[in-house]
């Protein structure tokens, strides 16, 4: 395991335990060169999951690619790293639970969209603007209207029942 601070390949494990969700092993490590401490998570390797992209090509599922897309959407939104990790794990688990070993990139995009919409509306708009390849300001307005309209409906429903 390479140190994320200095890149040295010699680290030692100083603490090991189960993660909070029980699906992975949490290891606290220390770099032998610079003494930087960091945490890693080990998880079992899933059955090989393939992603069919829009252009028809098929590639291996890349959890880091999923994480990067979500991190870009939630950047500077105050969303905790543990929340991002849980979201990535939930989406990957949902994909692994499916019978098919090949999933479409659009399915992954929809799962991310659904989760971000409930987590953070701004992150959701950021994500769908890239995922749906918005090219006109009206597309942003249409999506904002849908998000704000749903919030307004929820607000009116909660006030009418009082």
Swiss-Prot record:
<feature type="zinc finger region">
    <location>
        <begin position="3"/>
        <end position="34"/>
    </location>
</feature>
<dbReference type="GO" id="GO:0005524">
    <property type="term" value="F:ATP binding"/>
</dbReference>
<dbReference type="Pfam" id="PF22811">
    <property type="entry name" value="Zn_ribbon_NrdR"/>
</dbReference>
<dbReference type="GO" id="GO:0008270">
    <property type="term" value="F:zinc ion binding"/>
</dbReference>
<keyword id="KW-0238">DNA-binding</keyword>
<keyword id="KW-0805">Transcription regulation</keyword>
<keyword id="KW-0479">Metal-binding</keyword>
<dbReference type="InterPro" id="IPR005144">
    <property type="entry name" value="ATP-cone_dom"/>
</dbReference>
<dbReference type="InterPro" id="IPR055173">
    <property type="entry name" value="NrdR-like_N"/>
</dbReference>
<keyword id="KW-0547">Nucleotide-binding</keyword>
<keyword id="KW-0863">Zinc-finger</keyword>
<comment type="function">
    <text>Negatively regulates transcription of bacterial ribonucleotide reductase nrd genes and operons by binding to NrdR-boxes.</text>
</comment>
<keyword id="KW-0614">Plasmid</keyword>
<dbReference type="Pfam" id="PF03477">
    <property type="entry name" value="ATP-cone"/>
</dbReference>
<keyword id="KW-0067">ATP-binding</keyword>
<feature type="region of interest" description="Disordered">
    <location>
        <begin position="1"/>
        <end position="21"/>
    </location>
</feature>
<dbReference type="GO" id="GO:0045892">
    <property type="term" value="P:negative regulation of DNA-templated transcription"/>
</dbReference>
<feature type="domain" description="ATP-cone">
    <location>
        <begin position="49"/>
        <end position="139"/>
    </location>
</feature>
<keyword id="KW-0862">Zinc</keyword>
<protein>
    <recommendedName>
        <fullName>Transcriptional repressor NrdR</fullName>
    </recommendedName>
</protein>
<dbReference type="GO" id="GO:0003677">
    <property type="term" value="F:DNA binding"/>
</dbReference>
<keyword id="KW-0804">Transcription</keyword>
<comment type="similarity">
    <text>Belongs to the NrdR family.</text>
</comment>
<keyword id="KW-0678">Repressor</keyword>
<dbReference type="InterPro" id="IPR003796">
    <property type="entry name" value="RNR_NrdR-like"/>
</dbReference>
């Amino acid at each position: 395991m390479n140190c994320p601070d200095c890149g040295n390949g010699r680290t030692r494990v100083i603490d090991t335990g189960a993660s909070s969700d029980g699906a992975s092993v949490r290891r606290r490590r220390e770099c032998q060169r610079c003494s930087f401490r960091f945490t890693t998570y080990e998880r079992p390797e899933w059955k090989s999951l393939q992603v069919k992209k829009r252009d028809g090509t098929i590639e291996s599922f890349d959890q880091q690619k999923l994480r990067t897309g979500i991190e870009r959407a939630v950047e500077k939104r105050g969303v905790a790293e543990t929340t991002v990790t849980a979201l990535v794990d939930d989406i990957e688990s949902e994909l692994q639970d499916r019978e098919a070993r090949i999933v479409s990139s659009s399915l992954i995009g929809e799962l991310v969209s659904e989760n971000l919409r409930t987590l953070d509306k701004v992150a959701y708009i950021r994500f769908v603007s890239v995922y749906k390849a918005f090219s006109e300001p009206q597309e942003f307005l249409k999506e904002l209207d849908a998000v704000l309209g749903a919030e307004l409906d929820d607000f009116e429903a909660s006030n009418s029942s009082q």
